[in-house]
């Protein structure tokens, strides 16, 4: 098969085809030669030649067949065979473009006039069929028929079908009519981009409004027209491939002012192409997106890509920058000096700001600490007159409420949970302790009321008038859901039976049980309550002769252990050492090894005045102290576990300031503290 124009078949110029058809493989239909639209000067065809728009062909009547013979003068355009690169090819291209323009016009006219018949006519008689890219330059050796005819080497992938567009081959300087402008390119784009896949004529893109919709259309009308009306040399995507994404990079090499390739491109034939140099175009990346607002860059700037084939570009640019700075008559040096001074000033300012900020932070910390102390004092004052259940974290100023709580199911379940972790006797002691403490709080409240008249409660609604539309109501605070609910029966019942409340209630109950166990252990660790517990376990009543203050019995630090400062620890250790020394002086006559107490003591009364006045007695006491210290080191492992009891049972020092106090080694005390204590004891003058 002879290579035809654009693969539309063999457009033979021979006389064998008397009807002007394009080949035996195509449906026989009349060409445009005798359409009498552009060729009105041809008088060989009668002016009144009728044409029937049948479903199969554009044929004249039988009586006019002779006028369409091969030898007829009307066939001077019917020869579509490729010729050498002469002027005849340019005129041929111009006439083909004219017929394409006429096709788009007559297609719309026929569709409006004949309705559905126009659709069938165009489907059957439309001459776009499977074709190969036409090469109008056979004189050029080794030409790739699938390569678009641009003036630059743009390696553009047309897909697997290799379906080039109609006018892409002639996008170079071979287009004889660049002055047609944007309208010509628009119409040619409409005529060229109607088929997505030219291998199947059934996938006709119905971009005209009168065409009926088809299930084979993968894209909408707007998307089809926007993508395919500028498809010179690009070809539309076939139906075997998915449509391009709206957010992906453009498959087209460039879109200019109006978004159409036919208006202005790289070819330089259109007024908006701006004649870009070919070398610069080759340096561009293979695929790039839309150029915002054409070559003038009226939109946002696109990032310039580095030229990887020029490794010395950066060095050259750096050298040029250096030359510019050298030729600037010292302006760069002055600028650098100013920048250095400005940097030093900024550094000083930042240091000043940092110092001021640190001072402000210290002031803020001090104010916060003072506020914490005030809040702590206020809370302690409130705790002295507020009823409380420590294990349940229940507090109230009303006697009736605390009594209801102590008899409630919640309180009993909490104690039952604690009894699973602690002995039953200890849990009973906790219950008695809570009841007795609330009784003493009630007595204190009565005393305060007798001394001072009750202060009126401040009105929170003071200063709020009716213009603010406030109303005083009663509400319930759900601790589990952390929600305020108006005290209305319907609202309360609705919340009580809600799914969220029941879920939060179970979670809060479990959390309260765990917290109650921790609080109970914290209360029982207090040294005063430990003594009371011992008495209670012995069967005695620990609440009869209790003189300890209520606030020192562990309720101040509910839920947390009290942290002792190093000074408090050192003072307590010194008190234990002095107490042990006094007991050792009093027990001079007994051997130290015979005792099983926590502290190594020597029992026996010794007159303190005589010991201080007799040097022989003082020497004897020092020897006795050394022997006790050596024996204490030998039994250190045995008595290490009992150091806690020694600290709890140690009493305050009762010895006079003028007496000589020998040092007795205590298990668990550091050696440096012992040496310091011994030095202080030796420095005390004797009377």
Curated annotation (Swiss-Prot):
Residues spanned by motif Bipartite nuclear localization signal: 286-303
Region of interest (Interaction with MCM2), residue spans: 1-195
UniProt entry tagged with the keyword Nucleus: yes
Post-translational modification: Phosphorylated on tyrosine residues probably by SRC subfamily protein kinases; multiple phosphorylation is leading to dissociation from nuclear structures implicated in chromatin structural changes.
Residue(s) carrying Phosphoserine: 72, 199, 320, 325, 336, 659
Cross-link (Glycyl lysine isopeptide (Lys-Gly) (interchain with G-Cter in SUMO2)): 314
Region span, Required for interaction with MYCBP: 572-589
Superkingdom, natural source: Eukaryota
Gene null: resulting phenotype: AKAP8 and FIGN double mutant mice die soon after birth due to cleft palate.
Record field: compositional bias (Basic and acidic residues): 280-294, 311-320, 335-357, 633-648
Biased composition (Gly residues): 109-118
Role noted for this protein: Anchoring protein that mediates the subcellular compartmentation of cAMP-dependent protein kinase (PKA type II). Acts as an anchor for a PKA-signaling complex onto mitotic chromosomes, which is required for maintenance of chromosomes in a condensed form throughout mitosis. Recruits condensin complex subunit NCAPD2 to chromosomes required for chromatin condensation; the function appears to be independent from PKA-anchoring. Specifically involved in recruitment of CAPD2 to, and condensation of maternal but not paternal chromosomes.
Protein name per UniProt: A-kinase anchor protein 8
Source organism per UniProt: Mus musculus (Mouse)
